Amino acid sequence: MAGPGPGAVLESPRQLLGRVRFLAEAARSLRAGRPLPAALAFVPREVLYKLYKDPAGPSRVLLPVWEAEGLGLRVGAAGPAPGTGSGPLRAARDSIELRRGACVRTTGEELCNGHGLWVKLTKEQLAEHLGDCGLQEGWLLVCRPAEGGARLVPIDTPNHLQRQQQLFGVDYRPVLRWEQVVDLTYSHRLGSRPQPAEAYAEAVQRLLYVPPTWTYECDEDLIHFLYDHLGKEDENLGSVKQYVESIDVSSYTEEFNVSCLTDSNADTYWESDGSQCQHWVRLTMKKGTIVKKLLLTVDTTDDNFMPKRVVVYGGEGDNLKKLSDVSIDETLIGDVCVLEDMTVHLPIIEIRIVECRDDGIDVRLRGVKIKSSRQRELGLNADLFQPTSLVRYPRLEGTDPEVLYRRAVLLQRFIKILDSVLHHLVPAWDHTLGTFSEIKQVKQFLLLSRQRPGLVAQCLRDSESSKPSFMPRLYINRRLAMEHRACPSRDPACKNAVFTQVYEGLKPSDKYEKPLDYRWPMRYDQWWECKFIAEGIIDQGGGFRDSLADMSEELCPSSADTPVPLPFFVRTANQGNGTGEARDMYVPNPSCRDFAKYEWIGQLMGAALRGKEFLVLALPGFVWKQLSGEEVSWSKDFPAVDSVLVKLLEVMEGMDKETFEFKFGKELTFTTVLSDQQVVELIPGGAGIVVGYGDRSRFIQLVQKARLEESKEQVAAMQAGLLKVVPQAVLDLLTWQELEKKVCGDPEVTVDALRKLTRFEDFEPSDSRVQYFWEALNNFTNEDRSRFLRFVTGRSRLPARIYIYPDKLGYETTDALPESSTCSSTLFLPHYASAKVCEEKLRYAAYNCVAIDTDMSPWEE
């Protein structure tokens, strides 16, 4: 009876086309701020529940009926019940006695909070069990998360089955699920067809309700809120031991055996010890367990031990059938879902690792997690929507939490339908068709998609080329580059910049040499070798990463007090004025016509997206949106570039004539100033035409158009370079925020993130150096931690693995400066007298130790 889950095979092309029609209509409704299609909000008026079949359970139970002041989202002191944001909750008013084999009739309206899953009963349904109890409605707790199993489970409705047979003469099951109603509504078919069960109209209207002030931007904020909060749900999955009798593996090493799969420690792992492509994990499931989710914990830093493709089989004995085939994102550190939404018990589930990254021979898995239907999927937790959780989302503040909860439920339904067809739309869909364009308009919703990461990985893998047969060797003079950075006017052609030295060094030496295509596998993590003139380094990756960091700093300097040494980007007006948001950002220079180099910048961005390296470019969302193909708007995006101008035009639009003439007189002409301080005419001869009061609307539109398109050609060149390296389908699947993060890394370097990425070697757990190290990093600012990260790894953003060893001189020195080797991302940590001294030495090294002397080898070439 359940509809196809994400990634499931749809029953027919008719069903696929119907869902695409639905998505197009829903996308238009979302963009326009209209209610979503009614089929998406379907709630059956009647659902039957019975006691869960548990031989050890009681033969009857008393089900308390709770009453609230209307449906709400809070739990009061009276007990675990749905409630409202105002007024006290009432305690349980009565109880329904339910014996094994008997049923209780409820509506299909559900609510989930911290106490569990609730279903609603109408006055008529209550009367069947309690007579005239005086309640207008009541709520039953179907299951609690802590109970480990559902007390009540839904069943088919015999009355509905009988009525359908009498009415249509066909033995149809009633359509009770919203997915089926969507298919019935939007899929064209001949002949008789099932009919949906009677809808609970009041619940449908509550789901469809859109507040008068609600906009598409509110939906986007709600999606980001869910993305930020639901990302942690997999951390709370039940222990595998609840559902599995035993776990067998194909092979294992003595130190990293099968117990590491269930120890809830991401630092340990099971490692195989066998033949290539012959690795498996076999789960013997406990009787009655139905898998809702099966997740594997993987880590991209395992390199060629990381699984790349997993196939899951299930069944009984040796009669196993293929259930799923999953490609894993090679950049992932965390959980990947390899099986979900099973409807029957599978005695045996076998996870076969058919391919590892870079054709690795053995595999590492850091954990297995299971969510079972014995512990029913409760759904979205209404407790999320408390005012304290909404502070970062001003558009959502002030909206009734009940409204936010229902809207979120509806958006999750939309995402589920989108997931079921996404692999049909990307990458094979014709981009010229209107339907695809409409779905792209709601790209931010892809954040919640479960299918997208696998599709992105597949598109990148299918378009990658083999690694180059040789590694380019570049000779870089950073002393000249630093002199140029200090005074760019002495070198107008920017020949001494690291950027130019690398660009020229990578040019093919003759017509037979192919230029780099940057589409190599992610494992190929050093694109060229650097020889820094007059610096001690043998480049095994650290010098290369340093060259990328130097180019990033030249393109978009991190300090507002230094000149911009290259002509490709200029500071935003916000940075120059010290006003508005995003005061450290840059935009492409409208005057720079060197499109070949812009295209190369785009290629470097694509290479960073494909690999593990970063090109840190401080560009506002206004630019990233254009690169990823998302729409930009004046009111939403341009304040990050020039907030003063946006405000000025807004005020000008509402001015009366007297104020306008007093403010501008005859001085305002049809011209505007671009980000590079170039004055351009908005109309032919505009510099000599005064803007009158009646012309102001036209003037405003012309200014907005000119500024929005000021760097259109430069962005187009960058995008052309990006698309030479990354398929269009990948840009279609990534939001602009994700594109920025994949190219530039995560600007927030938190201590928690560093803890996950740091490995201490040859240290005792009680060693004071470990304690002092973390105390020091806790006292660092984000900028300090970013500088420290670059000192150790050559990267200034996460993720980047760090290996820490004791100082080479051991106990002979105290309070010395730390040393690092960026090629191996290694820090050599000395002894310190206190955490304060440790903090001072680490900070000094992070800001002052630029040359990479510890990479010098005694064997010179």
From Swiss-Prot:
InterPro entries: APC_su10/DOC_dom (IPR004939), Galactose-bd-like_sf (IPR008979), HECT_dom (IPR000569), Hect_E3_ubiquitin_ligase (IPR035983), HECTD3 (IPR042469). One of its GO terms (biological process) is protein ubiquitination. The modification Phosphoserine is found at S12. Keywords: Acetylation, Cytoplasm, Phosphoprotein, Transferase, Ubl conjugation pathway. GO terms for cellular component: perinuclear region of cytoplasm. It catalyses: S-ubiquitinyl-[E2 ubiquitin-conjugating enzyme]-L-cysteine + [acceptor protein]-L-lysine = [E2 ubiquitin-conjugating enzyme]-L-cysteine + N(6)-ubiquitinyl-[acceptor protein]-L-lysine. The keyword Acetylation applies. Pathway: Protein modification; protein ubiquitination. PROSITE patterns: DOC (PS51284), HECT (PS50237). One of its GO terms (molecular function) is ubiquitin-protein transferase activity. The active site is at C823. Residues 512-857 form the HECT domain. Its main location: cytoplasm. Its EC number is 2.3.2.26. The keyword Chloroplast does not apply. It is found in: Cytoplasm, Perinuclear region. Interacts with TRIOBP. Interacts with STX8. E3 ubiquitin ligases accepts ubiquitin from an E2 ubiquitin-conjugating enzyme in the form of a thioester and then directly transfers the ubiquitin to targeted substrates. Mediates ubiquitination of TRIOBP and its subsequent proteasomal degradation, thus facilitating cell cycle progression by regulating the turn-over of TRIOBP. Mediates also ubiquitination of STX8. This is E3 ubiquitin-protein ligase HECTD3. The lineage of its organism: Eukaryota, Metazoa, Chordata, Craniata, Vertebrata.
